[in-house]
Amino acid sequence: MYDKNGDEIPIFVDQADLDRFKQLSQQLAGCHSSLEVMPDQLPGVFNDGNFTLGESIADLGGVEIAFEAYTNRLKRQGFEGNQLRLQQQRFYLAYAHLWQAKYNALYAQELTLGRNELVMGKNVHSLERERVNGVVMNTDAWYDLFDVKPGDKLYRKPEERVHIW
């Protein structure tokens, strides 16, 4: 990172900051590694959370920042109560729609495991469904807006949710 004069700004102030970042990063990698890819067609094939970690951190941070900025703008425009809630829900629906995709098992397996030379090779991004699910299940607002409770498929306990930035 750089300041307005082009001088480098350290991302981590001290070793404790760096250690906490590494701990949270591993939590996020574990979360993404728990996501099964196309369970009906590829049972037992899971996302590689360590391989996709950099992009998963970027996705999570980006969504959290965008949601906060969007919410602040809505409030400045006078949205409140149920109307604010509806617009916030639409944010998450738009995010999911953005990553909507359809692919076959061979494609999914290749991008997840990188075992077939016919396709592009292993991808540093999670597949679309896992990319969305891995983000929303770590954002507290999603639980409130969609009334996600223990026992629901994408539920994570509050202490297990990862907030890096």
Where are these regions (language model features)?
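Zinc-dependent metallohydrolase catalytic domains
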Residues: 1-165
